[in-house]
Regions:
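Glycine-enriched, solvent-exposed interface loops adjoining structured elements
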Residues: 1-67, 93, 138-276
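Small/polar beta-strand repeat architecture
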Residues: 65-142
Length: 276
C-alpha cells in the first residue's frame, strides 16, 4: 500500500473525505494526517517487536588511547594523569585498562579534575613508572553498570541484548537511560525495532494498527469528537494487545539473582531429578 492509501484508511475510520495525494493535498484532514503521521508511525512501531521492522547491530566501545599521556604521583600518593584536553569533570567515573608500569591505574575510578589537561584517580595509589604509549580509558556510567553504549540513531525499541534465539527473556541484563544502553558487557549484539519508513514493506497487521492510531490522533480535529478518538485508541490497543501479552514490553531487564546451592529451590530441583 502507498502512504496515501494508508492515510485514507485512517480517514475512512473517521468517515472523512479521503485524499488524492496525502503529501500535497491542502484539505484540513490531509494537513492533520500529515502532521501526525510520523509521531503515530514511531509510536506504533515501538508498541511491539514487529518482525518486518526488527534488525540487528553490534555495539562496541570507543576507547581513548593513553598515547602522549603521563601518569605520575600527584604529591599525595594518588595517580595523576596528564592528558591534554581530556574533557573530564570532577565526579565522573572512568575505566582504565592495559596500562603498563603503573599497573595500579588499571581499574574503575572516580576522577577529580585539576585543570583542562590533568586529573587525579580518586583513592588510587601511585607506584612504578608508566610505560609510555600503553593503556586506554573510557567514560563509564556513574554507578550500577560498567559500560554505556550509544544506541543506533534509528532505534525505537530494544528487543534483545546479547540473547539467544527465542524468547525475549533470553536477553542479558541491561537498562536504557538518556538514549544510551547500560550493560556490563563490552560488546553488545543488539536486536531492535527501527524507524521503518518504507511503507511499501509494512505488513497488513501493522497497517491496521497504525491506521487506527493515526485516526485516534486526528479524530478530535476532523470530527470534533473526543469520544471517537478514544474509541479508535482502544481499537489500536486491541490489535496490539495480543502481541504484547506474548512479549516483554520493558526497555530493560534486571540482573538475575542465582539461588545458592543450599537453597530450598535448588534442593527441590535436585529432589525432583532424583525421584524422576
Amino acid at each position: 500500500m502507498t502512504k496515501t492509501e494508508i492515510c485514507n484508511l485512517a480517514l475512512s475510520l473517521l468517515s472523512a473525505n479521503t485524499a488524492t495525494d496525502i503529501d500535497t493535498d491542502t484539505t484540513p484532514q490531509a494537513e492533520a494526517v500529515r502532521r501526525w503521521f510520523a509521531p503515530a508511525r514511531d509510536e506504533c512501531l515501538a508498541s511491539h517487536p514487529w518482525n518486518f521492522a526488527t534488525k540487528r547491530a553490534r555495539l562496541t566501545l570507543t576507547w581513548t588511547a593513553l598515547s602522549g599521556v603521563a601518569l605520575a604521583d600527584n604529591g599525595s600518593g594518588e595517580i595523576r594523569v596528564t592528558h591534554t584536553s581530556h574533557g573530564l569533570t570532577t565526579g565522573q567515573r572512568i575505566h582504565m585498562q592495559d596500562v603498563e608500569g603503573v599497573t595500579a591505574a588499571n581499574g574503575t575510578w572516580y576522577v577529580t579534575r585539576i585543570d583542562a589537561d590533568t586529573y587525579d584517580l580518586d583513592a588510587s595509589v601511585f607506584a612504578g613508572t608508566h610505560t609510555s604509549g600503553t593503556g586506554e580509558w573510557i567514560v563509564a556510567p556513574l554507578h550500577g553498570w560498567d559500560y554505556k553504549h550509544t544506541l543506533p540513531t534509528d532505534n525505537l525499541r530494544v528487543v534483545r541484548v546479547n540473547g539467544y534465539e527465542g524468547n525475549e527473556e533470553d536477553s542479558a541484563p541491561y537498562a536504557i537511560e538518556e538514549s544510551v544502553l547500560l550493560s556490563d558487557d563490552t560488546i553488545i549484539d543488539l536486536q531492535y525495532v527501527y524507524q521503518h519508513t518504507t511503507v511499501a514493506n509494512w505488513t497488513q497487521d501493522f497497517i491496521n494498527a497504525f491506521a487506527a492510531l493515526l485516526a485516534s490522533y486526528v479524530a478530535a480535529e476532523i470530527t470534533e469528537s473526543v469520544g471517537r478518538g478514544e474509541t479508535l485508541r482502544k481499537q489500536f490497543e486491541a490489535i496490539v494487545a495480543p502481541q504484547k501479552r506474548r512479549n516483554d514490553a520493558r526497555t530493560g531487564k534486571g540482573r538475575t539473582l542465582q539461588p545458592t546451592f543450599n537453597s530450598q529451590l535448588v534442593a527441590a530441583r535436585r529432589s525432583s531429578i532424583t525421584n524422576w
